[in-house]
Amino acid sequence: MIDDLGVKVSVARPVQRVVSLVPSITEAIAMTCPHVLVGCTDYCIRPTHLEEIVGHEVVRVRGTKNPDRKAIIDLRPDLVVANQEENREHDVTLLREAGVAVWVTRIDTVEEAISSLTRLFEEGFGVR
């Protein structure tokens, strides 16, 4: 897979364990393929009954600008989803250096949002 920044992201497919560092993407995952979500930020407040929807505990990994990288690594995610604007490049780099696959979205327009999410869900989660 190639993320929105053109970086190759190697993952086992279909992805089974995801940490989302982007509140809007957390909501999209929870509503589309909830079983894969194992971690998200403290700012991921929608859907309001997240754990009820996904059917298991979703570990909170602090904020979008200060994620707990150790907690993320300990969750053994197949994929971490981040956003170029929302998350720090430093955290993405350190997660990748630790062997964690990170997909970074870059969304400036509605069209880019639709395209990015479509690719992520089709290529990463096997959702068609």
PLM regions and their residue ranges:
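N-terminal ligand-binding lobe of clamshell/alpha-beta domains
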Residues: M1-R128
